[in-house]
Amino acid sequence: MVLQENIPVPHFVLFPFIAQGHIIPMIDIAKLLAQHGAIVTIFTTPKNASRFTSVLSRAVSSGLQINLVKLNFPSEQAGLPDGCENFDMVDISKDIMYSLFHAVSLLHKSAEELFDKLSPKPNCIISDFCIPWTCQLAEKHQIPRISFHVTKEKIPVAMEEQQLKEFVEKMNEAEMKSYGEIINTFEELEEEYVNDYKKERNDKVWCVGPVSLCNKDYLDKAERGNIASISEQNCLKFLDLHKPKSVVYVCLGSLCNLASSQLVELALGLEETKIPFIWVIRDGTNKTQELEKWVSDEKFEERNKGRGLIIRGWAPQMVILSHPSIGGFLTHCGWNSTLEGISVGVPMATWPLFGDQFLNEKLVTQVLKIGVSLGVKVVMQFGEEEKLGIVVKKESIKEAICNVMDEGDEESKERRERASELSEIGKKAIEKGGSSYINMTLLIQDIIQLQSKHQS
């Protein structure tokens, strides 16, 4: 979409939350808005900005109008370790979670000072629902605030603590005042739910996904979210060695805090499948340090040389999932990962950890019927993982993965066919003339009309 010359170019200001699952789709939304002719400014902190600077630099070089405003993060003032600006930079406990939310609330004043100086004047705020003070910014400047939700539920289960009650109340209050909501999904995926939600929100709901598909450039795919901890060449070299649909990709998200004993059980389950695998583990946490000791002592990587690849830290997930050799995805059912799996037509084995992930699992396994559940019923509580210990036995892990990867079974074939069909629908949705493309156009037109009314 290219805006007509006589139409004022709208200026959207985006406020992503300080967690990878929130930042990544918001950056994609920024690119989509700019591709439709809008001016976009993103407010974030220095270390979070560094994760997508190269992606944005390429976007700007291509002619997109995207600007970046960096807010100094008050780590020390909030009682956080120096340099901690994201949920994935630290072992999460309930106290740490409270401190991170508190730090975000402290950004209000500096953000307001910089927002007031923006030129051209902003016409709309798109804010993560976890940043309620953006509602006050919108009211001050008499512009709409559109809420961005990563999750299906309004408040993640892990946040239902008394000390976080004040934050939750502020979020709910801001939601009541929001002009509308932008969602990373496509209408055809969950049509009934979308239609009902539109009625609830007075039709101010815009489904613009799968937003990950805005990344056409290979480097944009490889560096989406962060620079990978493994070279794409090494990753592709491993994948190229294996037959189509023969490798299972295992990633339980950037906030996976499973007990070390459970991670060992996962390793054993993977090994017993005899199926080639890529396994992504968090780097630098206490849990993974214990896992690393076990991996070294037991010579796990040597035992699985050529068949298994462990990626420590950030992985180029889009590059991996879209490779022909990937035949299944063991996922925590975070919405971004779920939608990325759907986008490339890969069936899933589901291992939800907390929050909306249990709802997403039901969508994948019971509604869309493109996944197999590992049968997890226990919600992971941050800081209490060791008390839970082993929730899923290696036998269940092996069974679910083998079920998903089986190409001879009729049920597995049907699952794979459904996943492939949804992938094609998702790709069409974001292309010109598709439902998500049209929704992005309608959103921009809505803001332009509001802008015109305000000026007249």
Predicted regions and their residues:
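Glycosyltransferase specificity loop/lid
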Residues: 1-247, 251-456
